[in-house]
A protein has these predicted regions:
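Structured, active/binding-site neighborhoods that engage oxygen-rich ligands
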Residues: 1-257
Length: 257
């Protein structure tokens, strides 16, 4: 794993040696290359962070509406305009669901004390579980295990679903100024609910991409950033999936490795 061992020592000092040893033995602590840049204009950074949050939450709300649809026709621009236009009598709402809610939970924990954030996230999930809308199987499994007394670092199922990825966005935003910590922090966050190296490495990659995108200078194109992160992913199944997904996008026509 390409992370600094001293970083794990700092996490162990707050989360406990048993937690870090358990997660490391199962190869759940991951890291990838997060490009680092000189500080950019503060207003530009705020605008990018706000845009990222708006995009995530809007996508969650629209996706929730789409999941309730009985058709497979997808959404067009008219659908988006109608759903953004406000709730009318007889028209279904477009509320945020568990992915956005847990995004906020992770962000708040990270902005408090990043080294305690995974444990705080687990505590918050238990405390606020009744407010979660449409949580996935992994979150429900984790919640049951936590309520039965499992430690936060051993409560998650071996899932590699995508429900932890919105929280990875929170890591990338909250720790954008600490690129050397982002991968490990994102993998620890994901491990709270998804005890699979595939899930935690995916979270590390997404958090790194988000951090690089919001901090990049305006003269640095996305095509120079994303492939660098993807190429540093260690698990072939994660790296290959991302390469295949992005290869058809003209923005990422450069080699990934």
């Amino acid at each position: 794993m390409n992370y600094d061992p001293t970083l794990l020592q700092r996490y162990a000092a707050t989360l406990g040696d048993d937690a870090i040893e358990s997660l490391a033995e199962r190869e759940l602590i991951r890291s990838v290359n997060t490009p680092a840049f000189d500080p950019i204009d503060a207003d530009l950074l705020v605008d990018r962070v706000a845009g990222t949050v708006a995009g995530l939450t809007l996508g969650d709300a629209l996706a929730a509406r789409f999941r309730r649809s009985r058709t497979d026709d997808g959404m067009d621009l008219a659908d988006v305009h109608r759903w953004l236009g406000g709730r009318r009598r007889g028209q279904g709402g477009h509320r945020l669901t568990a992915p956005s809610q847990t995004f906020v939970m992770s962000a708040e924990a990270l902005l408090g004390d990043p080294s305690r954030a995974p444990r705080e996230l687990a505590t918050t999930i238990v405390r606020q579980h009744r407010s979660l809308r449409s949580p996935g199987n992994a979150i429900r499994y984790t919640l049951d295990a936590l309520r039965q007394g499992a430690p936060w670092f051993e409560a998650a199922p071996p899932s590699y679903g995508n429900a932890a990825l919105p929280r990875a966005v929170a890591v990338g935003l909250a720790l954008h100024a600490l690129p050397e910590q982002i991968g490990v922090a994102a993998s620890l966050d994901a491990a709270v609910s998804h005890a699979s190296p595939r899930a935690t490495e995916s979270a590390a990659a997404l958090a790194s991409i988000v951090a690089a995108i919001v901090t990049r200078p305006e003269d640095v194109p996305l095509a120079d950033i994303v492939p660098r992160v993807v190429a540093s992913i260690e698990l072939p199944e994660v790296r290959d999936e991302l390469e295949e997904m992005l290869a058809g996008n003209g923005m990422f026509a450069v080699p990934f490795s």
